[in-house]
Amino acid sequence: VIIIAVLFLTACQLTTAETSSRGKQKHRALRSTDKNSKLTRGCTPPGGACGGHAHCCSQSCDILASTCNA
């Protein structure tokens, strides 16, 4: 009887985990779309602010001044 109960509970957990992962997959797709839209935005011109994730048009960020190089 105990073995049957354990198998039943395991099956319930697997079914719940599968359903949850499907919901998360939708959110992952949305996050991926959001990330792609950020990557397609325009670059920061020289003198503009840049940081750890610089998107400078010149591909060069002066970390000390936190500005994009020319």
From Swiss-Prot:
Keyword Ribonucleoprotein part of the UniProt annotation: no
UniProt signal peptide: 1-17
Keyword tags: Disulfide bond, Knottin, Secreted, Signal, Toxin
Disulfide bonds: 43-57, 50-61, 56-68
Expression by tissue: Expressed by the venom duct.
Proregion positions: 18-41
Domain of life from the UniProt record: Eukaryota
Cellular component GO terms, alphabetical: extracellular region
InterPro entries (UniProt xref): Conotoxin
Subcellular location: Secreted
Disordered: annotated segments: 20-41
A Pfam short name: Conotoxin
Coiled-coil positions: none
One Gene Ontology molecular-function label: ion channel inhibitor activity
Domain notes per entry: The presence of a 'disulfide through disulfide knot' structurally defines this protein as a knottin. The cysteine framework is VI/VII (C-C-CC-C-C).
Similarity-based family: Belongs to the conotoxin O1 superfamily.
Protein name: Conotoxin AbVIB
Organism: Conus abbreviatus
UniProt lineage: Eukaryota, Metazoa, Spiralia, Lophotrochozoa, Mollusca
